[in-house]
Design a protein with these regions (language model features):
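Extracytoplasmic cell-surface/polysaccharide-interacting catalytic and binding patches
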Residues: 19-206
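Extracellular and select intracellular beta-sandwich modules with Ser/Thr-enriched
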Residues: 13-18
């Protein structure tokens, strides 16, 4: 409670009590600082059940970065209009900005179907890449998406979020989102499973 005073033009002063209510914006709960990345069979798992530490900031993985640049070069050589630019590593703070923008625009329930909360994004691991057309649009369907689906595993990638698997991965299908896992990519691809199914780890919602 505070006191508010007012003086009129005749010099008369009046003081009245008033209550000041301060509303703080909702804060996103951060993963535990002491948490460590989760590895299963040598593969890092990042999903809505397995967050990364807030201070985990490895930058772009060198091997994965070289592999995504190779797949882009090969697609361009094959005649696809694919941008040399891609969305790769994101820091915790940058992911927080992106997520909050989506929440503000679409609401949290909708945003959670296509955007990760900070600390829960594969991009923070430096192992995930979003492939774009030459005009900057994400590769969502058509021949380019089909080529990626059929060939990404040869470069150590899997298409991480598949159609019909939303209840397992926690996200809508993203044909453009590649996750580098290395030598086991072909086995995952041929199994037709999500990474959660292949490794036998929990997925779904937070």
């Amino acid at each position: 409670e505070i006191q508010i005073s007012a003086i009129d033009k005749h010099g008369n002063q009046t003081t009245k009590p008033a209550k000041l209510n301060i509303t703080r914006p909702e804060r996103i709960a951060a993963p535990e600082l002491g948490a460590q990345p989760t590895y299963v069979n040598g593969i890092m798992v990042v999903n809505k059940k397995h967050p990364l530490p807030v201070n985990y900031a490895p930058g772009e993985n060198l091997t994965a970065g070289n592999a995504v640049r190779q797949i882009i070069a090969d697609m361009q050589q094959a005649g696809f209009d694919i941008s040399s630019s891609y969305s790769g590593y994101r820091s915790y703070s940058y992911q927080a900005q992106i997520y909050q923008q989506y929440v503000a625009a679409h609401g949290q329930a909708a945003a959670d179907t296509f955007s990760a909360k900070p600390g829960y994004s594969e991009h923070q691991a430096g192992l995930a890449f979003d492939i774009r057309h030459g005009n900057g649009a994400l590769v969502t369907n058509g021949p380019a998406a089909e080529w990626i689906s059929a060939n990404a595993h040869k470069y150590g990638f899997i298409v991480r979020y598949q159609s019909g698997k939303e209840h397992i991965t926690g996200y809508s299908a993203e044909p453009w989102h590649l996750r580098y896992i290395g030598g086991q990519a072909t086995a995952v691809h041929e199994s037709g499973q999500t990474l959660e199914e292949y490794l036998g780890v929990p997925g779904g919602s937070y």
